[in-house]
C-alpha cells in the first residue's frame, strides 16, 4: 500500500537521511565501494610487519592504529587480517573497526577521483533546498552504518548529474548539519540509537518534528518507537521489503515514498 507522504501534527523541520538504498543506489556500496576496499586492502596490509603485537604501542599511522584494535590472533599475519575483513564484508557485518578502515581507504579513492557518489538527483535537490525552504532553520542530518568520515567523503564527492564535464563533483556537506554512525549513535535497528540522536540534536521534547527516511523497515520501526516520524523509501534495485524482525508484515502501516520529490514539507 502506498500513501502520500504528507506531514501531520507537528510540522517537520528536521530530516535524518539514511544513505544506501535511500539517497544513493544500494548497488554503489555493494558493487563499487566494497569491491574497491577489498581490491586495495592487500597493498595496504603489506606495508606492515607481522605479528602486529610486536609493533610499538603508539604510531602516527592511522591504518596501523585501526588494525591494532583487532585481537592478536587476527593480527598475526596480513593474510589473517585480510580474511577477517573479507568475511565481514561478505556477510555485510556492521563492524566499527571495519568501517573505520574502509573510510580511510575510500578517502584515498575519492581524493584520486577513482570514486564518485551517484546520489539521486531528487536527493541532491532536496539537500540543497530544504535548509532554506523555511525561516525556521530546517536541518538535515545523516545516519548511516558507515563511519562519519566515510559519510563526509561521500557527500563531498557527489557525481554531478546536470553537467557534461567529466569527473565533476558536488560538495553537499555545507548543506548538512551533522552526521551519526554506529559508534556515535548505536545500531540502526535499535530505538535507543534514535533517542540518543534526538538528545544530540536537542529534539527530545519534540520528536515528531523529526523525520527519518530509510529503505529498511526495521530502522523505520526503531525510529518510530523512539518518537520520530519515519517513512520507507523504495528505490530501483532495492531488495523487497520483508517482514520486520518480529515477523510482522506491517509495512502497510507505513508511509512509503519512491522519491524525495514526494515529500510535502
From Swiss-Prot:
Sequence positions that bind substrate: 144-145, 188
Keywords: Amino-acid biosynthesis, Cytoplasm, Hydrolase, Magnesium, Metal-binding, Methionine biosynthesis, Nucleus
Residues that span the membrane, as ranges: none
One GO term describing the cellular component: cytoplasm
Uppermost EC category: hydrolase
Pathway per the UniProt entry: Amino-acid biosynthesis; L-methionine biosynthesis via salvage pathway; L-methionine from S-methyl-5-thio-alpha-D-ribose 1-phosphate: step 3/6; Amino-acid biosynthesis; L-methionine biosynthesis via salvage pathway; L-methionine from S-methyl-5-thio-alpha-D-ribose 1-phosphate: step 4/6
GO biological process, one term: L-methionine salvage from methylthioadenosine
Subcellular localization(s) per the UniProt record: Cytoplasm; Nucleus
InterPro entries cross-referenced by the UniProt entry: Enolase-ppase_E1, ENOPH1_eukaryotes, HAD-like_sf, HAD_sf
Cofactor requirement: Mg(2+)
Keyword match Kinase: no
Entry binding sites for Mg(2+): 18, 20, 215
Catalytic activity: 5-methylsulfanyl-2,3-dioxopentyl phosphate + H2O = 1,2-dihydroxy-5-(methylsulfanyl)pent-1-en-3-one + phosphate
Matching Pfam families: Hydrolase (PF00702)
Entry similarity comment: Belongs to the HAD-like hydrolase superfamily. MasA/MtnC family.
PANTHER family in UniProt: ENOLASE-PHOSPHATASE E1
Function field: Bifunctional enzyme that catalyzes the enolization of 2,3-diketo-5-methylthiopentyl-1-phosphate (DK-MTP-1-P) into the intermediate 2-hydroxy-3-keto-5-methylthiopentenyl-1-phosphate (HK-MTPenyl-1-P), which is then dephosphorylated to form the acireductone 1,2-dihydroxy-3-keto-5-methylthiopentene (DHK-MTPene).
Subunit-level organization: Monomer.
HAMAP family: Salvage_MtnC_euk
Protein name (record): Enolase-phosphatase E1
Biological source species: Candida albicans (strain SC5314 / ATCC MYA-2876)
Organism classification: Eukaryota, Fungi, Dikarya, Ascomycota, Saccharomycotina
